Curated annotation (Swiss-Prot):
Binding site for [2Fe-2S] cluster: 92, 94, 112, 115
Highest rank taxon of the organism: Bacteria
Recorded family membership: Belongs to the bacterial ring-hydroxylating dioxygenase alpha subunit family.
Organism encoding this protein: Pseudomonas putida (Arthrobacter siderocapsulatus)
EC number(s) reported in the record: 1.14.12.-
Pfam family, one: Ring_hydroxyl_A
Keywords tagged on the record: 2Fe-2S, Aromatic hydrocarbons catabolism, Dioxygenase, Iron, Iron-sulfur, Metal-binding, NAD, Oxidoreductase, Plasmid
Lineage of the species this protein comes from: Bacteria, Pseudomonadati, Pseudomonadota, Gammaproteobacteria, Pseudomonadales
PANTHER family the UniProt entry points to: 3-PHENYLPROPIONATE_CINNAMIC ACID DIOXYGENASE SUBUNIT ALPHA (PTHR43756:SF1), CHOLINE MONOOXYGENASE, CHLOROPLASTIC (PTHR43756)
Protein's recorded name: Toluate 1,2-dioxygenase subunit alpha
Cofactor or coenzyme needed: [2Fe-2S] cluster; Fe cation
Comment on bound cofactor: Binds 1 [2Fe-2S] cluster.
Gene3D superfamilies for this protein: Naphthalene 1,2-dioxygenase Alpha Subunit, Chain A, domain 1, Rieske [2Fe-2S] iron-sulphur domain
GO biological process, one term: toluene catabolic process
Membrane-traversing stretches: none
């Protein structure tokens, strides 16, 4: 019996508590420390549902490839000679060695360095080494039997590539739901769309992956954890009034209005109005955006900072800098984060400002990330003592469905918060996680029953 078989539905059901009448919104800290839950998450969330893989701009040319992970499984994405994108498990169909061992490159064919089998970048086995007299059976390499294993579901939305190793998942657009409209507001900043800029930062923190997924939409911690950044920015503002490359200030973040939106399938967003939107790289484009998309959407594109979580592994952040933040769980208490700066294509005159804003706050050597990582470590250490995490802040003014601001931009969240410090979005996200864990336990139980019956 596998370790996950010792997980009962009653245990899963007890991990997240929500009682509106009693004002209880909390979760047990075991959900961040139990290795049995981590095994289920890897199999049924990171390998068994849609997750973010890459952006199309990272595989721009024919024969380009890009490697990444889906849970515990290595993946690579290729653009073949016809310009079509494909995603495969990064393992030779012969004996399982990885084919692509660099982050990215350009190859029309991929030859395994173990036994020399060669595959096209469309996944077809082209040749095996020394086939003459090898004595392969007649069934060898028939009907694609030894081609590379494709990622079961692979799709793009506005240049963002997603995959699932399980076939029976909802269509991607249905999975993304209302969060697609937020993606649209970021992509539509340029007629040519977005591109990922060269360079990245990767780091590992000592904590569960869900801590980062929470924190990316946690407006409550900003003034406490990032007070030093806010103070530094205020000094810069006074000292460098004529600076062309101005970092966005955190000193009044959320003070000009903000809130959150919870969407279906664990997606969520925290937002806040900028006190100084004129420092945004896109500010000069406001008239064009208003003409194309209307005043309300143009206001959101420029005047509002937003952190959008595309559950479970991507944050699309458009605030102190513009970035993709990708979460990769390594173990129940270790998580790898990779961040990339993104920008509208063709933004050359304002590119420097965008990159400097990104580096200032978010880079691994920036003024915010190290502070966050220390809090993640401290949380994971504290979780060992058990107990409950409270998520009730703002409960008296959460709004079922869209608030007035969401209606102005035709956004229909499941829950709205009127302040960026409110915690209702964590309740919604962890309830979705709980539902996925219940489904996972049932699938594992059904699999065991089927195996015992054979």
């Amino acid at each position: 019996m596998t370790m996950t078989m010792h997980l009962g539905l009653d245990y899963i059901d007890s991990l997240v508590e929500e009682d509106e009448n009693e004002g209880i919104y909390r979760c047990k800290r075991e959900m961040f420390t139990d290795p049995r839950l981590f095994d289920l998450e890897m199999k049924h969330i990171f390998e068994g549902n849609w997750i973010y893989l890459a952006h199309e701009s990272q595989i721009p040319e024919k024969n380009d490839y890009y490697t990444t992970q889906m849970g515990r499984q290595p993946i690579f994405i290729t653009r073949n000679k016809d310009g079509e994108l494909n995603a495969f498990v990064n393992a030779c169909s012969h004996r399982g060695a990885t084919l692509c061992r660099f982050r990215s490159g350009n190859k029309a064919t991929h030859t395994c360095s173990f036994h020399g089998w060669t595959f096209s970048n469309s996944g077809k086995l082209l040749k095996v080494k020394d086939p003459k007299g090898a004595g392969y059976p007649d069934s060898f390499d028939c009907d694609g039997s030894h081609d590379l294993k494709k990622v079961a579901r692979f799709a793009s939305y506005r240049g963002f590539l997603f995959g699932s190793l399980r076939e029976d998942v909802a269509p991607l657009e249905e999975f993304l739901g209302e969060s697609r409209k937020v993606i649209d507001m970021v992509v539509d900043q340029s007629p040519e769309g977005l591109e990922v800029l060269r360079g990245s930062s990767t780091y590992v923190y000592e904590g569960n992956w869900k801590v980062q997924v929470e924190n990316g939409a946690d407006g409550y911690h900003v003034s406490t954890v990032h007070w030093n950044y806010a103070a530094t920015q205020q000094q810069r503002k006074l000292r460098d009034a004529g600076d062309d490359i101005r970092a966005m200030t955190a000193s009044s973040w959320g003070g000009d209005g903000g809130g959150f939106y919870s969407f279906e399938n664990g997606h969520q967003m925290v937002w806040a109005r900028w006190g100084d939107p004129k420092n945004r790289p896109l500010f000069a484009e406001r008239d064009r955006l208003a003409s194309e998309f209307g005043e309300a959407r143009a206001d959101w594109m420029i005047g509002v900072s937003r952190n959008l979580c595309l559950y479970p592994n991507l944050y699309l952040m458009d605030q102190f800098g513009s970035q993709l933040r990708i979460t990769r769980p390594l173990s129940v208490d270790r998580t790898e984060i990779t961040i990339y700066c993104i920008a509208p294509k063709g933004e050359t005159p304002r590119r420097a400002r965008r990159v400097r804003q990104y580096e200032d706050f978010f880079n691994v050597s920036g003024m915010a990330t190290p502070d966050d990582l220390e809090e993640f470590r401290a949380c994971q250490e504290g979780f060992a003592g058990g107990g409950m995490n409270d998520m009730s802040r703002g409960a008296k003014h959460w709004i079922e469905g869209p608030d007035e601001g969401a209606k102005e931009i035709d956004l229909h969240p499941k829950l709205s918060g009127v302040r960026s410090e409110d915690e209702g979005l964590f309740v919604m996200q962890h309830k979705y996680w709980q539902q996925q864990m219940i489904k996972a336990v049932k699938r594992e139980q059904d699999r065991l029953i089927h195996a015992e019956g054979v």
